[in-house]
């Protein structure tokens, strides 16, 4: 699952993949998935901006588990996927990953304004249909980026929706589901605690707004200008913490 998959310009199973750097000095890196198109098609494609999971400490946008999921999504949804290479803790503590993710959204906005250039996006992207998606800690980032986007002029681009997939929302106090959930070697509560200790700003607890956007320290959801959300949470999953 954690093996990196190299990009390929050829369409393999209907999808081509390339890695790009946005700007010479920004250091922002993205992986772009482009579905193969019918020669007669003139319709532009929606854009899905993806933030990977990994507890803010592990994982990369080019790992096989993401390649497998997002090549399929690009093909089935007929959408362009743009996945952000996120800076990882503890070398880069939060909000570094959120800042990089938001920079990715602003890069898409710049391309939509012709202030940036990316051939696949310039030719095929429908910037009126841009969505955010992220799994686990990437779901937390989806919420942070969506909240910031509400205070930003994104025109002519439009943020059409956000999809947090089993977001890693939690509190300092263990939830009922955390206490009842059977632990596995793949992910234990101690591992989650360690990830948060390494990722959150020094001195912060899991009640920090990034890990606990429903807590008292976070702005009220009613006060945020958010796009439509589709939450994906598995029953009996370890992320039913709120």
Question: Predicted regions span which residues?
Answer:
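Cytosolic, low-complexity regulatory segments enriched in Ser/Pro/Gly with interspersed Lys/Arg
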Residues: 1-3
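Alpha/beta-hydrolase superfamily serine-hydrolase fold, recognizing
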Residues: 5-242
């Amino acid at each position: 699952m954690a093996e990196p998959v190299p990009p390929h310009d050829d369409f393999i199973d209907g999808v081509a993949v390339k890695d790009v750097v946005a700007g010479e000095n920004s250091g922002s890196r993205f992986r772009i998935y482009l579905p193969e198109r019918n020669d007669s098609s003139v319709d532009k494609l929606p854009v899905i901006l993806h933030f990977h999971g990994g507890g803010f400490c592990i994982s990369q946008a080019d790992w096989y588990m993401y390649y497998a999921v997002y090549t399929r999504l690009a093909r089935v949804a007929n959408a362009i996927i743009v996945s952000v290479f996120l800076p990882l803790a503890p070398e880069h503590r939060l909000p570094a990953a959120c800042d990089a993710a938001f920079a990715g959204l602003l890069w898409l906005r710049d391309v939509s304004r012709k202030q940036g250039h990316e051939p696949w996006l310039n030719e095929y992207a429908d910037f009126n249909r841009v969505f955010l998606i992220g799994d686990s800690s990437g779901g937390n980032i989806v919420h942070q980026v969506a909240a910031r986007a509400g205070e930003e002029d994104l025109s002519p681009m439009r943020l059409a929706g956000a999809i947090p997939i089993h977001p890693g929302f939690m509190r300092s106090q263990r939830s009922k589901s955390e206490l009842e959930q059977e632990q596995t070697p793949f992910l234990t509560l101690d591992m989650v605690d360690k990830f948060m200790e390494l990722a959150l700003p020094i001195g912060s607890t899991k009640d920090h707004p990034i890990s606990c956007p429903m807590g008292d320290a976070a702005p009220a959801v009613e006060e945020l200008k958010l796009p439509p959300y589709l939450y994906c949470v598995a029953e009996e999953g370890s992320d039913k913490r709120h």
